[in-house]
Regions:
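N-terminal targeting/trafficking signals and adjacent low-complexity tails
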Residues: 1-215
Length: 215
């Protein structure tokens, strides 16, 4: 299928901080504060740095295998997990806060970008393997940061008396928002039906994992 694409400069989106825009633009003023700007050469340098700082891959493999235990996942995911045992495998990591209902589209963009970068790195450095890793930062935020989501012109706010790490919160009191979102969807449209199933089966259990796994 042919697709037309348009590249939009980060700065024109007005969705990123000046720090991020300057970093992507390789502003020399940032040089004293960073190790390197993103480039193929900097990726090669990072490979050499990581090779000098090995980790216990057996523990890494076991922990991630335990996290996936009992879940349905693709053969590619299984292959990637086993690749972690090799000293020639490196990870491309990205993370996101556990925003309700996935939060902004940027959540999906970050996952897609990590997958694409891992594939590009394999082309750049065919002697090595690269595994994209996405994880949720569930312990370092509060409800004020992640407790709302904008759908169209409406802002939905998680009304809860719970406190502490959001990753440990019970999602039962998201029921009113779930019902409001379900009312907006059409079960006769395949993509919308998929979202409805996610809301019904996941949110009220494992929505974020169910949403991100197919990506």
């Amino acid at each position: 299928m042919h697709m037309n694409t348009i590249s939009i400069p980060f700065a024109t989106t007005q969705s990123f901080s000046k720090l991020v825009v300057d970093y992507v633009a390789k502003d020399s003023a940032l040089r004293p504060f960073i190790q390197d700007f993103p480039s193929r050469l900097s990726l090669e340098n990072q490979i050499q740095i990581r090779k000098k700082n090995p980790v216990n891959r057996e523990i890494l493999f076991q922990v991630i295998s335990d996290q996936y235990k009992g879940l349905k996942f693709s053969d590619e995911v299984s292959s990637n997990i086993h690749l972690l045992l090799s000293q020639k495998t490196f990870t491309i990591c990205t993370a996101h806060q556990p925003c309700i209902f996935g939060g902004p589209l940027y959540f999906i963009y970050k996952i897609a970008h990590a997958i694409r970068l891992a594939k590009d790195c394999k082309e750049y450095f065919p002697d090595f393997d690269f595994v994209p890793v996405f994880y949720m930062g569930t312990e370092d935020n509060d409800i004020a940061e992640i407790g709302s989501v904008n759908v169209g012109e409406h802002k939905y706010q998680w009304q809860t008396q719970q406190t502490g790490a959001c990753g440990r919160m019970n999602t039962n009191d998201l029921q009113p928002i779930c019902e409001a979102l379900l009312a907006m969807l059409n079960e006769n449209v395949a993509d919308e039906k998929w979202l409805m199933e996610l809301l019904r089966e996941g949110y009220l259990t494992n929505f974020i994992r169910n949403l991100s796994e197919p990506l």
